[in-house]
UniProtKB/Swiss-Prot annotation:
Its EC number is 3.5.1.138. Residues 9-27, 650-661 have a biased composition (Low complexity). Optimum pH is 7.8. It comes from Enterococcus faecalis (Streptococcus faecalis). This is Lipoamidase. Residues 1-52, 551-686 are annotated as: Disordered. It is found in: Cell membrane.
């Protein structure tokens, strides 16, 4: 969620020097190593997890009751000769699909066609996918050979940020890079291909992955499959929505502060943030903060993906004795409010674990979250100069306000005044907190918390107060101390929803989000298991314990009506709405603690600065939504959108409380993203134009790490940024 890093620990830019390196050869060498990557299954650690995937492989039906759209842009149905239905596909895990392909009961090409058809039909509502590569994916599926790949022929969606695939869009969320494509394929992506996945497209994310929601100005808002009135999370929001909606069984993501686990919690999917340095192709972010991995619908698939991408051969098998106490807390590490629903989710998990014979001990949260996050934001702001670097390379001039969203601009201006000494001090303090956490794990091997403090917030809530947006527009007029305080203050509203995820990244520890809870409004909520470095398998065993005992609780998404043309709105018929009043559940105990610390947050008037450009919330102008196709959900009044259960939801009490102070006046007109949802899917000529480097041209390259992951602009000359003295 909220931080960007560079390959250097300090990244305030004053000048550059170019260092020529054989980048392409290095990447090639790394990629060649992935071909020998095999699935490592430790017997002791995998027995419980294997049990969760031991059910019979989905039976191949001879019925074709689900009409599958052709992958071609004409939208015709797949031939009736196909015996594998869309329903079969949506119910199957990635491992089951690979087994079917291996046993020749279905072809990878058929699976890809189904995945493309679902995506093109349902994406106009969710805006989870930003590009499709139909022709390439079908060609790769047809040519696929079985060499023992664990995910043979399984369709996969790739996160659009930080995971380069040669020839595909590589914008980092910047409008001025809308035509840029990757000049090479990253090691992580190559490893996914070597594992047998067929990449069918790329998923939505916020600009540079800064946020815990995906509300990109360029691509629009990625919304939640369980209720499109709510966010899908960030920064891997498109990935979470794609998996929850069964576009694909697994989508790749990246996590530098919760960017896998936050969407997992809010979309009812499984999200693992692996330990520092154990996954192939991990970024070179400072202290290994960013990791690349994926989201899935089952712990079994997550475990198989982990073992496939694992590079550390001596990782412990993982074992949690019932004699070892498990710690739990529902306290926010920063003292911010936590919803009653999140507390209930943890309480249910505690009761289940006690029934299984484990000892549970309630503790105070061992981390000083306010102190940790101030260090976190120092590191983030110190690396925002990457936006200026890219603007200079592409536009041949310094970065200007209109080039980027408001948050990127504010971080860039703040970063100019952050010295290398400040960044070093921040990391030193983080290391001290990590040491204290390591000592905690000596007594309690597991810490159980909510993954997020509440269910997904409403898309009417930009998670930015209007007075903060106004101050950010003039941030260059503030002192360095005032700038840093503003960065902390403006992020506090968003951080209040997700205070539990950042420590795992900064400390290098693994963390697993498992979807065990569904609110009365039908929105998912995850619980999070945290442990010490390299104890990933222990976490996966705990997740498997919940899965094997049917404690994975995911909302049900109704199948579309096959007898009529799909409605891109995703709304049920209004006359069937049992409760369109929008009133909150009267029986639900309100949580009035959703307000941030009033001593730290200026009073939110709710009125925008009329003279200021709206913030970079990524939300479309409501007055234009029904007139254009530029909003996240076309032709829809987003204040009147019932959920899929047929009722208007009020969201969590925490959501209501924060909405009351933050959702007025900060609607952004910046969210006129470049591609309408309808034109984006199924009409390749309207996707970003692919501009490849000329043969023999030396293309500048940089390897910067953001909250959402690492991005490699292209291979060529690497520019190393000097830090301010």
């Amino acid at each position: 969620m909220l931080a960007q890093e560079s390959i250097l620990e300090t990244t305030v830019q004053t000048e550059t020097e170019s260092v020529t390196t054989e980048t392409s050869q290095t990447v090639a060498n790394l990629e060649s190593e992935t071909t020998s990557q095999t699935v490592m299954q430790e017997k002791e650690s995998s027995s419980a997890i294997a049990e969760s995937s031991s059910r019979n492989v989905v039976a191949v039906t001879t019925e074709t009751t689900n009409e599958i759209q052709n992958s071609g842009t004409d939208g015709k149905a797949v031939s009736a000769e196909s015996v594998f239905s869309e329903a079969d596909y949506k119910q199957a895990t990635a491992l089951e699909l690979a087994t079917l392909v291996r046993e020749k009961k279905v072809t990878s090409e058929e699976l890809v066609k189904i995945a493309l058809a679902i995506t093109k039909r349902e994406n106009p509502t969710l805006n989870a996918v930003i590009t499709l590569r139909e022709e390439a994916a079908l060609t790769e599926a047809k040519a696929l050979q079985d060499t023992g790949q664990p995910f043979l022929g399984v369709p996969l969606l790739l996160k659009g940020l930080g995971q380069s695939l040669k020839g595909e869009s590589n914008t980092n969320g910047f409008g001025f890079l809308r035509d840029q494509v990757a000049g090479g394929t990253s090691t992580f992506v190559k490893a996914l291909q070597n594992a047998g996945f067929i990449i069918i497209g790329q998923t939505n994310y916020p600009e540079l992955g800064w946020k815990n929601i995906s509300d990109s100005k360029l691509y629009g808002v990625s919304v939640n499959p369980w209720n499109p009135n709510h966010y899908s999370g960030g920064s891997s929001g498109g990935a979470g929505a794609s998996v929850a909606a069964a576009f694909v069984p697994i989508a790749s993501g990246s996590d530098a502060g919760g960017s896998i686990r936050i969407p997992a919690s809010w979309t009812g999917t499984v999200g693992l943030k692996p330990s520092r340095g154990v996954i192939i192709g991990n970024s070179n972010s400072a202290k290994g903060q960013t990791v690349h991995f994926g989201l899935s619908r089952t712990v079994a698939d997550t475990n198989a993906l982990f073992e496939t991408l694992l590079t550390k051969k001596d990782l412990p098998a993982g074992h949690l004795s019932q004699a070892q106490p498990i710690a739990y807390t529902t306290e926010s590490p920063a003292g911010t409010p936590v919803s009653a629903e999140a507390k209930e989710a943890v309480a249910e998990a505690v009761a289940f674990l006690k029934d299984q014979g484990y000892t549970l001990v309630e503790v105070k949260h061992p981390v000083d979250g306010e102190r940790l996050m101030k260090n976190y934001y120092t590191v983030a702001a110190g690396s925002a100069g990457i936006a200026d670097f890219m603007a200079r390379q592409k536009l041949k001039r310094p970065l200007e306000r209109n080039d980027v969203e408001l948050l990127t601009w504010a971080l860039f201006q703040t970063g100019k005044n952050i010295t290398s000494e400040e960044t070093t001090a921040a990391w030193t303090d983080i290391a001290l907190q990590a040491q204290a956490m390591d000592e905690f794990y000596q007594q309690y091997p597991i810490l159980l918390t909510p993954t997020t403090a509440a269910t997904a917030p409403s898309i009417d809530n930009p998670l930015l107060k209007p007075e903060h947006a106004a101050q950010m527009e003039k941030i260059d007029q503030l002192s360095p101390a005032e700038q840093k305080q503003l960065i902390y203050d403006q992020w506090l509203t968003a951080f209040t929803y997700t205070p539990f995820t950042q420590q795992a990244n900064l400390f290098g520890h693994p963390a697993l989000s498992v979807p065990t809870y569904v609110s009365k409004e039908g929105l998912p909520l995850g619980i999070q298991f945290n442990s010490a470095l390299n104890e990933d398998r222990t976490l996966l065993q705990l997740g498997a314990l919940f899965e094997n005992n049917h404690k994975i609780n995911q909302p049900h998404v109704e199948e579309p009506d096959k007898d009529k043309e799909p409605d891109a709105s995703g709304e049920p018929e209004k006359d069937k709405d049992p409760n369109a009043s929008g009133e909150p559940d009267k029986d639900k105990e309100p949580d009035a603690s959703g307000e941030p610390d009033k001593d730290k947050e200026p009073d939110a008037s709710g009125e925008p600065d009329k003279d200021k450009e709206p913030d970079a919330s990524g939300k479309p102008d409501k007055d234009k939504e029904t007139k254009t196709s530029e909003g996240p959900i076309e032709g829809k009044d987003q204040n009147q959108n019932p959920d899929k259960a047929g009722k208007t939801t009020s969201g969590s009490s925490l959501d209501n409380s924060l909405n009351s102070s933050a959702n007025q006046g900060t609607k952004s007109t910046e969210s006129t993203h470049a591609f309408s949802n309808k034109s984006m899917i199924g009409k390749q000529e309207q996707l970003p134009k692919k501009v490849l480097p000329k043969a023999g041209a030396e293309v500048p390259s940089t390897f910067w790490i953001v909250l959402g992951g690492a991005f490699l602009v292209t291979s060529g000359t690497i520019y190393i940024r000097k830090t301010r003295k």
